[in-house]
Amino acid sequence: MSSHEREEELRKRLRLIHLLHQTIDSYPTGPGTANQRRQRRRRWRRRWQQLLALADRIYSFPDPPTDTPLDLAIQQLQNLAIESIPDPPTNTPEALCDPTKGSRSPQD
């Protein structure tokens, strides 16, 4: 993977983490009894912890392997070269010399 591809992969991951961060509600404030406010804060804290765990998994997820089967096949095709070509035969087979022998009739 080139450095440009790595940077692009990192940008994608950071954009995904940023999107997740935007989806979570802001820190809870507002009216309610002390118990209601406490419960809202606890729920918010649990969601925030889940977001952090998910972001950590996204960020630390290993990069895809650089040598996928397609990449390996392309590399092998690029390395192909004709090393030695045998000399053509000096004598011609009889079937090629005499068109009546070995050839099929058009009615067959």
Swiss-Prot record:
A single GO molecular function term of this UniProt record: DNA-binding transcription factor activity
Report the record's Gene Ontology biological process terms.
mRNA transport
Question: According to the UniProt entry, where does the motif Nuclear localization signal and RNA-binding (RRE) sit in this chain?
Answer: 33-49
Q: Key word Transport present in the record? A: yes
* Highest taxon of the lineage: Viruses
Pfam short name (any one): REV
Q: Which GO terms describe its cellular component?
A: host cell cytoplasm; host cell nucleolus
Report residue spans for region: Homomultimerization: 16-25
| Keywords linked to the UniProt accession | Host cytoplasm, Host nucleus, mRNA transport, RNA-binding, Transport
Q: Region Disordered: list its residue ranges.
A: 83-108
> Which compartments is it annotated to reside in?
Host nucleus, Host nucleolus; Host cytoplasm
Motif Nuclear export signal, residue range(s) on this chain: 70-82
Its biological purpose is as follows: Escorts unspliced or incompletely spliced viral pre-mRNAs (late transcripts) out of the nucleus of infected cells. These pre-mRNAs carry a recognition sequence called Rev responsive element (RRE) located in the env gene, that is not present in fully spliced viral mRNAs (early transcripts). This function is essential since most viral proteins are translated from unspliced or partially spliced pre-mRNAs which cannot exit the nucleus by the pathway used by fully processed cellular mRNAs.
Assembly and partners?
Homomultimer; when bound to the RRE. Multimeric assembly is essential for activity.
UniProt remark on domains: The RNA-binding motif binds to the RRE, a stem-and-loop structure present in incompletely spliced viral pre-mRNAs. This region also contains the NLS which mediates nuclear localization. These overlapping functions prevent Rev bound to RRE from undesirable return to the nucleus. When Rev binds the RRE, the NLS becomes masked while the NES remains accessible.
Q: What is this protein called?
A: Protein Rev
Species in which this protein is naturally found = Simian immunodeficiency virus (isolate Mm251) (SIV-mac)
In the UniProt record, the gene name given for this protein reads: rev
